[in-house]
Each structure stands twice: as C-alpha cells, then as structure tokens.
Amino acid sequence: MRVKETVRELHPCFGQARNKGRIHLPVCPACNIECNFCDRKRNTYENRPGVTGAILSPEEAVDALKKALELCPEITVAGIAGPGDTLASDGAIKTFQLIKEHYPDLLKCMSTNGLLLKERADELIELGIDTLTVTVNAVDPKIQAKIISGIYYHGKRYEGEEAAKILIENQLEGIRRIAAAGITVKVNTVLIMEINRYHIKEIAKAVREAGATMYNIIPLIPQHKLKACKEPECKDIDGARCE
C-alpha cells in the first residue's frame, strides 16, 4: 500500500511537505504498558518522548489548536501521541471528534503502542484518522519480554512472555484492520542494541505483511531500566536499516 497523495502533500513526516506544519496535542494521561525505556514525567524543561508540561482536555486542545492556526496558518496536521497511550483513555478520540467538526481539512495523525488497537480500530476508521503510527519493538515474545515489564489489559496486569504475546497479537491484527481501511500506517521501532538489534528484519517483514506503508527505526534514549544500554550511533541505525 502506498502513502495517499493528500498525506504526501500535507504531512511533513510522510512526504515532501517541507513548508507545512503540525501540532501535537497532549491529551492522553494514562498508559497501559510499562516499557523499560520509558520515564514519563510532567515538566517544562525536558524535550523527549513521554514528557509534557500539561495535560489538556479535548476542549482545551481545540482552543490551543485555534490559537496555533492563527499564529501559524501553515499547520496542516493535528497530531496526538501522548504523553500516555492514545487508546488507553478517550482523550484522543474526543479531541479528534472536535477537530473533525471544527477543522475538517486538517489531517488527523495518531500514534499508539497498539495494545488496544485491535479492539478500537473501528473507532479510528469511523473517525477518519488519516495516518497512524504504531510502535512495534519486537514480534518475538521472548525479545519483547525484555523490553516491557508488563501490560495492563482489561483490568488485569500481565507480565513476561504472556504480556508480550498479547501485545504483539493486538499490534499486528490492529495494523491489519487499519491498513485494510486504506489508512496510512507507519511503524516505529526503538533500536536497542543489546536486545533487538538483530531482530529488525523480522519486525519489518511482519509489519509489512500486516499492511504498514512505512517503517522507521529510532534510537533508544538510555534511561529508566535500560539506562545502562548503549545509545545507538548513526552507523548502528544505518546498519539496521540496511538489513
């Protein structure tokens, strides 16, 4: 499946839209996965994934979007990526419903860990999400179990390979459903040299077969339980991408 022409023209992350802008709206407070590399915080001095200065309500987010568009009319994409997971609460869905109502021409871009993607795919399809990014760090439960400590799924906490199997199954089936609806799907993988460096090819193959259009490898920021791991260098990322 190819990237839609509209997405290519208007989304700076998916094509040649270098003069277009995007805004990320922090409306998701909760997360349902304990990633060993994630240290979520609320402050105004760190600039990394998992950190935000505040959590907005859907109404506050749309108000912020309105002000941003007044200052920067080049914005063509409204994105929601956290700071928690976008499907672990209803903040993202409600925000996109308001954006669809008030700013129907904006692209709606969402990121998720994919744990609830299989069961909430129909909501996203009905909502008219334009692009979806799913973080898939392994498709082998033994490897995934080294990356996450556990998941919270339907009111119960799962650990180890049991948690990993649930996550992987839901991610891949969710991608299949979203891609089958014609939505552009990108997959991100956090490159962890000590854990999934030689697993990249298998991940890429699995997500491609599920329907993902783009595959992106991003470097680990060593922190939290993986703070002793090596930070990947450019040559490491290039090597993984060439496999």
Model region roles, listed by residue range:
Residues 87-218:
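Conserved AdoMet/S-adenosylmethionine-binding subsite of the radical SAM
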Residues 45-48, 142-145, 155-157, 223-228:
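A short acidic, helix-capping loop that chelates divalent metal ions and anchors anionic groups
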Residues 48-55, 148-151, 160-161, 229-233:
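Short glycine-enriched, charge-decorated loop/helix-capping segments at active-site entrances
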Residues 1-19, 201-243:
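Auxiliary Fe-S-binding modules of radical SAM enzymes
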Residues 11-57:
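Canonical Radical SAM [4Fe-4S] cluster-binding loop centered on the CxxxCxxC motif
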Residues 26, 79-81, 186, 190:
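Conserved beta-strand segments that form the floor/walls of ligand-binding pockets within enzyme
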Residues 60-81:
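Short Fe-S-cluster ligation motifs
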